[in-house]
Amino acid sequence: MMSHIRLVLCSALLSMMSCPTSGTIGEMLSLAASSNSSICHGMQFTEPTESFMGILPNETLPMFIFSIMHSEAVPKVGKTLRISHDMKLFGGEAVNYMIFVNKILYEPISYYNYTGSCRQQGLSSCVRVYSDLVNGSKGNPSVKLGFTAIELNKTKNTDFHNLGFKICFSCRDHNGIRLVVYNKNNRTAQLMMCPSELIFSQDFTINSTSVNPSEEAAVPLLNVTGYTCIALHNKNMLTHHSPALSSGSKVDNTLEPGCDSNVGLFGHSTGTDYGWGLANFFSAGITNSLQISQLEHVTDAIACKIAKTSNYTTTALFLLNKEEGEIRDHVIEHEVALNYLLAHQGGLCSVVKGPMCCSDIDDFRRNVSDMIDKVHEEMKKFYHEPDPFGGLGTWGFYGTIFGHVLQWIPIIIMVVVVCFVCSWVRK
């Protein structure tokens, strides 16, 4: 019964929301999983510092550059678009901007004499942008943004009356900040948009003449309000910004073919010292060389075991690091999806209250990857010294027998000498 009620509620919630454009949710989720993915609330907002709206003759070259700033901020020198943040989409900390394009204007030649006009500034056409269309931009006067005739002529056709420019919102990466456009009217979000309601008769037609030389010629634009550009910002972007493991860290399990990691451990007691002492006495110190040889073999085996253990450990860390990163990305994706679905209610934290709503998931994948790389660099410092007697190994079993015979020849000679001395003394 409860599952049926939940299904009905979910269906009702989805029916309240307009169907988003194709790929909208996928774009937001892929954005959340990217290097600029946000932490707090799934979306943590900052005020954009550069323009993300312009009149574009094509998709690559903006016709003019202007900045976007807070309505209470001090205007910058140059073309500045001041836009109020009349809507808090995802909570009180968000700085969201509404953009209103009212009409496109052409100033007659007589406007050369008007101080501050586009014509007087050497510009030939303008777009009047309002920061608050409903309240008549109270406290925030409208701003006209213009572009030069040279720029207009770049796309001029045979009929110079029709120049065909579109007003588009571009919310692609800009100076390291990625933006998303959210439309509060139909509750859709896109990374880049030039919707049909922003286009008048397919393209804007900027007339080069006016019926009344003392008035502006205006082409009205309808249904263009209600768009908000949202800046997604990762607060860890200065320290842990890049995706982890992007440096191509690879686990190297290759060791020398002759690497033997079997280490024999012997118990040590007082009797051990006595035994080796007697052996050294009767063998005239020959057993010392045997001990040194055995110690060298054990040292090599220990180094080999350290290298293998290090590789196994770094492999485990590599996989755990990758798994933790994937879990973190999925958590952020789910937070963004919840914020997207609950946007009309103020976001996830407006519905679910509590101190843990803002989940701060630090991203240390890069740090772990760097440590793994350092371990690999240290392990590369292990190297094999050439064995001056390595050639004997090619003799196989006979080489081993020959080596043992050589070790016992001094002892055999000493026994023969002692026997000879004893026989001589008896005589």
From Swiss-Prot:
Which parts pass through the membrane? 51-71, 89-109, 401-421
Q: Which GO terms describe its cellular component?
A: host cell plasma membrane; membrane; viral envelope; virion membrane
* Residues in the Extracellular compartment per record: 2-50, 110-400
- What keywords is this UniProt entry annotated with? Fusion of virus membrane with host endosomal membrane, Fusion of virus membrane with host membrane, Glycoprotein, Host cell membrane, Host membrane, Host-virus interaction, Membrane, Transmembrane, Transmembrane helix, Viral attachment to host cell, Viral envelope protein, Viral penetration into host cytoplasm, Virion, Virus entry into host cell
The residues that carry sugar chains are N36, N113, N135, N153, N186, N207, N223, N311, N367
Q: What is the recorded function of this protein according to its Swiss-Prot or TrEMBL entry?
A: mediates virus attachment to host receptor and fusion of viral and host membrane.
What the record says about family reads:
Belongs to the reptarenavirus GPC protein family.
Question: What is the protein name for this chain?
Answer: Glycoprotein
Q: Which organism is it from?
A: Alethinophid 1 reptarenavirus (isolate AlRrV1/Boa/USA/BC/2009)
Q: State the taxonomy lineage.
A: Viruses, Riboviria, Orthornavirae, Negarnaviricota, Polyploviricotina
